Amino acid sequence: MVTVPLRWIAIDLEYVRDEMNSKFCVCEIALRCIESNEEIYRTYIQPNENFLVSRRLRQKGITEDDLRQAPTMEEVDRLLKSLLPSFMLVFWNAENDLKHYPNLKAYAYGTRCCMKRYSERYGPYNYDFGDHSFIKLEDAADATGFIMDPEDSYHQASTDAKACAFIWNELNKESLPASISLDLVLRDDVHDLLEAREKTLKLEDKTSDENEIPLPF
């Protein structure tokens, strides 16, 4: 059996609507290594359904031909099935993305939601909701100091995966315990044991001196 290290990967999906405007179809996916900040995979996806390219996508320069000529959902799915078993996938909104692409949870080693993790710490408390309100990716990215490259824009899979990876890393930094100075490492119970040992050694030395037979000269 060959083992491989577990990798933490930020993932983002983008969508188009079908021509009946009744459901979302995945049209783009990007995966980015959280530790190395390296893009692992990104592609447009040819939706299974007849689809509509929204004005927002057209403004980003994405055309219907871009999606028609992209790999099919079946081709991408086969690749991800072989790629994901050693990946812990980190979504911004895991519930939404897994609703539209549930196979990701089955293929991956595990899944995490960055939006929930961030919002539980920084989201304003909503008394009607009974929990912290969810924070938008753009707002969380701005708050944590994420800086986009000139070619980046939100609601592109590569940009959103990059922002998600950055935020997760920042949360990890905050979660690490502060370094402990060496003079604090000695716990009270260890100190007591050492002190008792020192007293025992002194007592043994004293007893040895009292029982010593003096030399005749």
Regions found by a protein language model. Give the residues of each.
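Cysteine endopeptidase catalytic domains of the caspase/legumain-like
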Residues: 147-152
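Short alpha-helix plus adjacent loop in nuclease-associated cores
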Residues: 112-132
